[in-house]
Amino acid sequence: MFWHVPGLSAASPENFKLEDLLDEDEIIQECKALNTRLINFLRDKVQVELLLRYIVEETPEDAEKKRIFRFPFIACEIFICEVDVILKTLVEDEDLMNLLFSFLKPDHPHGTLLAGYFGKVVICLMLRKTLPLMNYVQGHPEIVSQLVDLIGITSIMEVLIRLIGADETMYTSYADSMQWLDDIQVLEMIVDKFSSSDSAEVHANAAEILCAVTRYAPPALATKISSPSFVGRLFHHAFEDSRPKSVLVHSLSVCISLLDPKRLVTASYQAFRSQLSHGTLVTASPETVNGMLDSLGDLLKLLDVSSAENILPTTYGSLQPPLGKHRLKIVEFISVLLSIGSEVAEMRLIQLGAIKHVIDLFFEYPFNNFLHHHVENIIVSCLESKQDPLIAHVLDECKLVTRILEAEKNSALSVNLTKHTLSAEGKTAPRVGFVGHITRIANKLIQLSNSNSTIQSHLQQNSGWAEWHGSILTKRNAVENVYQWVCGRPTSLQDRGRDSDDEDFRDRDYDVAALASNLSQAFKYGISNEDVDEVSIFFLFFARVSIFFLNITLLLRYS
């Protein structure tokens, strides 16, 4: 028996073809099981070349379906089974590597299906044959520019992210190759795609790579991307005439990634960086922040919606004009800019009237919850700031408390309050959608007034605040306090801030006994009737099973 695969008992190496093998149902399982005779057949250079051709060469449209779909898929799966001798045959042969990377040539068709298979094979080589692959790429620097040219294909983008080390998986054994990538100016090639292409997919993927560089790349690349000159290059492309708005949106995404202090960094990568440099994680320097602030005035001009004439019909009326993704991204950028605690940034935002402008947008677009989320973060950052001028600016010049009280009195759409969000004629104006955010901002004001005399004094001077707080806000908080509900959150969580966006569910210490008790109490009424329907029986069964497992968890935790 040649291979222990059904249907192959009569086969022999002399008369058996690769296509016959790829047509077998259990070929992948046998590969993973390291079937000796099968592996010895596939490791041959002739067979590896045929497998590669299935992956990199487009199939004629009139070919059989299995040639178009099955054979390329199986060929890719054979490579990513990570059989060492097969991968060794590939990486140690220059002609085979040339065939693999011929997929990237400009005159070659680049279908997304085969691009996905190509990407999987190359990433597998990066993981299992790192040094030979990097030596090959370093000897053929045109591969990097070809990858950048195809950056609009997501699978090619993933290859490029791995290649420059901007991924959680670190290749500590080729730090010198990372330096070589910096020397050929790979980051400059990527950022120039913002100028040379009008494709939104290209812009999104270019930004994805640059954001990954800010999180995981080696120090040389991370230092370059956070430099004032590189940030200036980003904004230059963003403000070029006739460039699509996607350039601005994704350029700001890169800046946000540089500024965001909460970006994820794994422990393994922290250890890797400590071996390469003696510094801490590279973040945006004060000079880089100042470079961003130089473009802030131009960004704020784009927030002006008064000259826009486009209209978006909605179910409740119309938006005249709609806010747009680019304006939303600018507001997010301002939010992150305030979160870094830069006094220079805070003063510049005050001078340009940026905070007042975004608060106006908050009320003018009452159903844009993405906008409300970012503006709420901006307001909270200002109120929690240690700079009294910033707090005074929000309370006095932006008239935050007055705006809140006015919105509460006029909770339906109106031209005076929501200038660009209009209700349809003949229909009852709907209730505005930012009441929940207003409630959270008001509660934050009350919380901070206990420790901040400026906020406390401002609230005391506003006669309408005390009345609204006593008659409306207090009752609303009592109704919305889910900790008091029978089926609400466990009592052990009452000391936590309600609806905290920054709270990680993995960090919560749930009171398992309270969960079981509440669940039991919620389901114990009205379920003993003989005429109960099947749905109720299902929920009863589900509740009892849940209680059982909660009790088991409780026993395991405290036993």
Explain the meaning of each model-derived region.
Residues 264-340:
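Extended repeat-based solenoid scaffolds, especially LRR ectodomains
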